[in-house]
Amino acid sequence: MSGLCFNPFRLRWSLRSKLPLEPSLPNLPCNPSSSKTNRYAEAETMEKKRFDSMESWSMILESENVETWEASKGEREEWTADLSQLFIGNKFASGAHSRIYRGIYKQRAVAVKMVRIPTHKEETRAKLEQQFKSEVALLSRLFHPNIVQFIAACKKPPVYCIITEYMSQGNLRMYLNKKEPYSLSIETVLRLALDISRGMEYLHSQGVIHRDLKSNNLLLNDEMRVKVADFGTSCLETQCREAKGNMGTYRWMAPEMIKEKPYTRKVDVYSFGIVLWELTTALLPFQGMTPVQAAFAVAEKNERPPLPASCQPALAHLIKRCWSENPSKRPDFSNIVAVLEKYDECVKEGLPLTSHASLTKTKKAILDHLKGCVTSISSPFSSSSVPVNA
């Protein structure tokens, strides 16, 4: 904790005089000749300036009409986030409508994701609100070592926030960007891949499809363990099994999603195949292409990132299975975990990854041969064949 540097302010709960629930925008000049679009653009600019001010963020969260939630493992899940215990620190990531800050909540290092809900764009507002509700609803019921832990949430339009555990080493994409191409050891590749696949195996066991699995949404902690994060576009499989539309990111998106066809949990397996390729190369998938060009290459030409010659054949085979064009040919994460665990055992025993597969095939071939020999031999005392299991 001592190493964290925080801004000298704290969100206090009702310690000041009552603040306005939502600071009003300055009056815009009335110009009969200006179009409605221009007026909305000016209003949006004013709102953005207000939102960009850290002071206004704290004012909104300090207001009395704040809906709060806090995760609990009891029979009844209650969310009672105590904002007097929340300290906001420095921003370390941002997006089009969100910012992520370091913070402390109840003496624990946390990440505070703040989402700005625009008031002048109805479609965007509805989409962001739904993503926020979905992420809170899903995260609050997920408990696994390889899933980022939800701690609390608060909602005060136009600012919504989600508080999760702080992952000090950033995301997997940042980690790979610092590495030389093809430089990760097979031990590291398998360790990271196992973390991801175990988290995804659990997620699918809970009936959840992530829909945006990528290196940017995989976070690393102090021990360099990976946790799956960012559930804004996730959904329960019963609610999105036959859903259409592309909710993920093109470079990692399965072809059926790009084509807006019905899809299943196997879209996550495809994305994992791309991530596994990233681990073996440390490169950005479809580097040199724009996201749209990458989507076209996958959907129309069935292209995939090139597998390097240095990639272990067994690992290359798994990657190809994961990103198969036919979803039914992609393995489940339970199978992926089992395969990676066997590969990990081979590496620890100093054996090549192909050894396990080769030994399995050899053993099966020997058993089949013996079975054929035994069943073809007739007993001298009986015309019946010798039982296989005799």
Curated annotation (Swiss-Prot):
Locations listed in the record: Cell membrane
GO biological process: cellular response to carbon dioxide; protein autophosphorylation; regulation of response to red or far red light; regulation of stomatal closure; regulation of stomatal movement
Enzyme Commission code: 2.7.10.1, 2.7.11.1
Subunit and interaction comment: Interacts with DTX56. Binds to MPK4 and MPK12. Associates to CBC1 and CBC2.
Cellular component terms per the entry's GO annotation: plasma membrane
Protein kinase domain mapped to chain residues: 86-359
Annotated consequence of substituting residue 113 to M: Loss of kinase activity. Impaired MPK12-mediated phosphorylation
Maturation and modification: Autophosphorylated.
Keywords recorded for this protein, A-Z: ATP-binding, Cell membrane, Kinase, Membrane, Nucleotide-binding, Phosphoprotein, Serine/threonine-protein kinase, Transferase, Tyrosine-protein kinase
Top-tier EC class: transferase
Protein name (database record): Serine/threonine/tyrosine-protein kinase HT1
Disruption phenotype: Suppressed low CO(2)-induced stomatal opening and impaired CO(2)-triggered stomatal closure.
Binding site residues for ATP: 92-100, 113
Active-site residue list: 212
Assigned protein family: Belongs to the protein kinase superfamily. Ser/Thr protein kinase family.
Note: 'Suu' means 'mouth' in both Estonian and Finnish.
InterPro entries reported in the protein's UniProt record: Kinase-like_dom_sf, Prot_kinase_dom, Ser-Thr/Tyr_kinase_cat_dom, Ser/Thr_kinase_AS, Ser/Thr_Kinases-Pseudokinases
Domain of life, source organism: Eukaryota
Tissue expression as described in the entry: Mainly localizes in guard cells. Expressed at low level in leaves, stems, roots and flowers.
Pfam annotation, one family: PK_Tyr_Ser-Thr
Reaction(s) this enzyme catalyzes, per UniProt: L-seryl-[protein] + ATP = O-phospho-L-seryl-[protein] + ADP + H(+); L-threonyl-[protein] + ATP = O-phospho-L-threonyl-[protein] + ADP + H(+); L-tyrosyl-[protein] + ATP = O-phospho-L-tyrosyl-[protein] + ADP + H(+)
Main localization of the protein described in the UniProt heading: membrane
GO MF term list: ATP binding; protein kinase activity; protein serine kinase activity; protein serine/threonine kinase activity; transmembrane receptor protein tyrosine kinase activity
